[in-house]
């Protein structure tokens, strides 16, 4: 995975956690962040990328 994209995901997950969001809310925010950073990615691809980071 692209390290910059991974950083976007980790930052979004951290921000969502700090805001008190649950797992689903954190994932949703991270997917939106991925789509802003990489508009060429579909929602499905963005979700896959977020899930890969969750598993690490």
Where are these regions (language model features)?
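C-terminal alpha-helical interaction appendages
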Residues: 1-56
């Amino acid at each position: 995975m692209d390290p910059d994209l991974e950083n976007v995901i980790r930052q979004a997950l951290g921000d969502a956690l700090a805001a008190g969001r649950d797992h689903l809310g954190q994932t949703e925010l991270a997917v939106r962040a991925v789509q802003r950073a990489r508009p060429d990615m579909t929602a499905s691809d963005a979700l896959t990328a977020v899930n890969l980071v969750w598993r690490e």
